[in-house]
């Protein structure tokens, strides 16, 4: 073979060697059965390390059973849900920190999963989440006393009600790590903070927007951007 015919293969080899991570982005969860959820040019990563930048930009791969997951990670494969550690006192915080694991839905022994019976474990998890919210917001776990007019001294703000509904949804539905999950950002009084953001997508920040204390978008503010924009200063917690 003449020297000029060797030049194109040699250049191709050098270009592939110069790319970070080789010819394929190393993405977790690109195994058999879930390959349809992986972007093009994505190879399976056996060591379970962090996804490469190219993989995060493509949206990431579906997480397999036993892999780490959370609110800000790629979804678990179909049929799996992102579950916090079994004896975790703050399950929501564990999911926000990415300390969950993809696994099959936990069903108590001897119970038909199709039957909608109340479960003691679910009630306990809801109580734990409620205590976690109250601890973070600085409110007391004791019920508020009613005044002479029959109205509680401390009423739940609109943002706090919204947050409770999100927590209830996470308890009752199969949680697969939705990329567009919105957890409202509340102040200690239960009202909305000015800056609200959706969950991140891989290594990219989720879209943000500005609202007033009751949750209504401020004039000129719309959902979008990379999450780096700031809201005007002022009242509303």
UniProtKB/Swiss-Prot annotation:
Q: What is the lineage of its organism?
A: Eukaryota, Metazoa, Chordata, Craniata, Vertebrata
This chain's source organism reads Bos taurus
Do you know which CDD domains this protein is assigned to?
TY (cd00191)
- The Thyroglobulin type-1 domain extends over 156-231
Localization, UniProt: Secreted
Oligomeric and partner information: Interacts (via C-terminal domain) with PHB2.
In Swiss-Prot or TrEMBL terms, this protein is called Insulin-like growth factor-binding protein 6
Q: From the Swiss-Prot or TrEMBL record, what is one GO molecular function term?
A: insulin-like growth factor II binding
All copies of the IGFBP N-terminal domain together span 26-105
According to its UniProt entry, the function of this protein is described as: IGF-binding proteins prolong the half-life of the IGFs and have been shown to either inhibit or stimulate the growth promoting effects of the IGFs on cell culture. They alter the interaction of IGFs with their cell surface receptors. Activates the MAPK signaling pathway and induces cell migration.
């Amino acid at each position: 073979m003449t020297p000029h015919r060797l030049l194109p293969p040699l250049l191709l080899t050098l270009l592939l060697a110069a790319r970070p991570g080789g010819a394929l982005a190393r993405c977790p969860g690109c195994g058999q059965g879930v390959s349809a959820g992986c972007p093009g040019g994505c190879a399976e990563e056996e060591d379970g390390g962090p996804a490469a930048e190219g993989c995060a930009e493509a949206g990431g791969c579906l997480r397999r059973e036993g892999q780490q997951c959370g609110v800000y990670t790629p979804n678990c494969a179909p049929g799996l849900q992102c579950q916090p550690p079994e004896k975790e006192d703050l399950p929501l915080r564990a999911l926000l920190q990415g300390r969950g694991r993809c696994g099959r839905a936990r069903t108590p022994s001897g119970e038909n999963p199709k039957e909608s019976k109340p479960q003691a474990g679910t009630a306990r998890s809801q109580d734990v989440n409620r205590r976690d919210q109250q601890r973070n917001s600085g409110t007391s776990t004791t019920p508020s006393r009613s005044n002479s007019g029959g109205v509680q001294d401390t009423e739940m703000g609109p943002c706090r009600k919204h947050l409770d509904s999100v927590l209830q949804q996470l308890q009752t539905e199969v949680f697969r790590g939705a990329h567009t999950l919105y957890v409202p950002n509340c102040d200690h009084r239960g009202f909305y903070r000015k800056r609200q953001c959706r969950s991140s997508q891989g290594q990219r920040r989720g879209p943000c927007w500005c609202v007033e204390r009751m949750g209504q978008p401020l004039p000129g503010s719309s959902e979008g951007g990379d999450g780096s924009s700031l809201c005007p200063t002022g009242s509303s917690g």
